[in-house]
Amino acid sequence: LPRSPDLVFSSEDYGEPWAQLMRAKHFLVDRDRTEFPISGSEIRKDLGEHFHWLVPSAKEDLCRKFVMVGAESTGKTTIAEALAKKLNTVWVPEHGRWYWEGRRYLKDQSWSTDEFFRIAKAQINLQKDLARLVSKGILICDTDALVTAVWHQRYLSEFDKLENFMSFNDLPDLYLICCPDFDWIQDGTRESKD
């Protein structure tokens, strides 16, 4: 923490001495566990099983993020959605696709670095928003800022901005690399099977 908290809320016996160590005021809450029938110690023993007890801001920080990466038409969206369904969790669609669909009829199809930065930031913000809804501790992401950086390089041939994109991105717990091991399908938004 950047500074000591002023208040500590707990339902644990160690709450008072813990708060004193930080020079904070302690508030004992629900000691008999009538409102929240689980202790912090029990939650920590099996975080995935008890993830639903966490407040949204804690879910955002503690959920495990699995990100799909790969070329166009490699099944990223299909796999992300199927994994979320199988794991009964949240999945994050690709913001860049929505953005592209929104601008696709412009006469001037040139892109700017600023657009890619906004796409990357929006993708990360969408991940953070949806992470707050996770109930089982896992967030499935169709893409992330790293993939946006690759598209930036493809469209603008600028290879020196990777660290700028990655500054938006918390590294995921797992990248799932989708390979082009089946036929490429044109869905109206894809550019090239190469």
Range-by-range predicted roles:
Residues L1, Y14-G15, G137-R154:
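A basic- and aromatic-enriched beta-loop-alpha substructure that forms the phosphate/nucleotide-
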Residues L1-R64:
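Nucleotidyltransferase catalytic core that binds NTPs
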Residues I43, W151, Y155-D194:
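A glycine- and Lys/Arg-enriched "phosphate-lid" helix/loop adjacent to the NTP-binding pocket
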Residues M68:
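Hydrophobic anchor at the beta1->P-loop junction of P-loop NTPases
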Residues E72:
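The conserved Walker
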Residues K76:
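Conserved lysine of the Walker
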Residues I79, L83:
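Hydrophobic positions on the alpha1 helix immediately C-terminal to the Walker A/P-loop
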Residues K85-K128:
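Conserved substrate/cofactor phosphate-moiety recognition/catalytic segment
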